Amino acid sequence: MAGSSFGTIFRLTTWGESHGKGVGVVVDGVPAGLSLSEEDIQFYLDRRKPGQNRFTTKRKESDTVQILSGTFEGKTTGTPISMVVWNEDQHSKDYSDIASYYRPGHADYTFDAKYGFRDYRGGGRSSGRETIARVAAGAIALKMLSELGITVSAYTRSIGDVEIQSFDAVEIANNALNMPDAEAAEKASELLTKAMAEKNSVGGVVECVVHHMPAGVGDPVFEKLDANLAKALVSIGAVKGVEIGDGFSVCIATGLTNNDAFHVNADGSIVKLTNHAGGILGGISDGSDIVVRAGFKPTPSVAASQQTINKDGENIAIEIKGRHDPIVVARAVVVVECMTALVLADALLVGMSAKLDNVKKVWALDEK
């Protein structure tokens, strides 16, 4: 299977299935000397793990990470970092019926069409459990970015038709849906409760903001920073769309209302007076906050009756059994953070060779 690796220098390769023995990742290109512990990784995995509230799957997993290689005495060595999380609570018997039919909204049919085979137990590689590997790798990227003063923060912007109307960063950790607006979180909880009672599910939007990203990161044409962010986010299961900055609303704007005016401060620093572009111009960061949004579809595994076909080509009705999230948005917040961080870490390392001055700073002989 191709397509399990991501990145150029800061590069990860993920492996494992939802109902296999475990999920893991190998991360190449991490600079030597970065302080790193399993606790650093675990902090982010704990934000993603299931079974923490009534709006997540009841699957109980500790999601405890083990670092197998690439560190010594608490620091990265510059060699590949291998990590694993063992599966503990897979109920494969819940999926025995699925072997005979294709679930609407899932990758069952397309995997069969491509490979002539599929792991029907929880979706195999297309399961949301695959994101464990992304989060583990992203935690390293976030640690590296923090060394540069760069922060990446994501939160739930909307669930269904309920969108935040205010922003309080403290509130994000105070509700199960990771919304920075307490009133919106309460309304979204009511919407989800209603959907669950109707054996249904809901989608939503995660917004991610990057602070203190320097100008000049990213490459034009095929390696644009926004293009790579879009690819990274759309690669997350259930993401169906991405916006950068003002996104699709610029389509009804004018040039004058959409353009971000530049200004020179008294200290000589260059800033923009607005940020409709979302911190990226021409595929390169402009020094403003980078703002991206990922739109998630409703969870396709719903308990209500649905029409589909079996592998014999017969039309049938099904009611999906098993333990499923009524919404993936809240748990996906940390996944969006981590995928964003992976793109930025890679772009920063790639960009070090863009100027001769950068190369000289590292490799030029001391003339003294």
Task: Place the predicted regions along the sequence by residue.
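N-terminal, positively charged regions that mediate nucleic acid binding
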Residues: 1-59
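A short glycine/serine-rich beta->alpha loop
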Residues: 11-14, 119-130, 215-219, 275-280, ...
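Glycine-rich anion/phosphate-binding loop at the beta-strand->alpha-helix junction
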Residues: 15, 21, 199-202, 206-315
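Alpha-helical support elements that line or immediately flank enzyme active sites
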Residues: 21-33, 129-150, 223, 227-231, ...
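Glycine-rich, N-terminal phosphate-binding loop and its surrounding beta-alpha-beta segment
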Residues: 44-104, 108
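Short acidic, glycine/tyrosine-flanked loop/strand segments centered on an H-E-D-like triad
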Residues: 99-124, 306-324
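Glycine-rich, mobile lid/loop segments that gate access to catalytic sites or pores
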Residues: 113-221
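Internal helix-turn-beta structural module
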Residues: 301-368
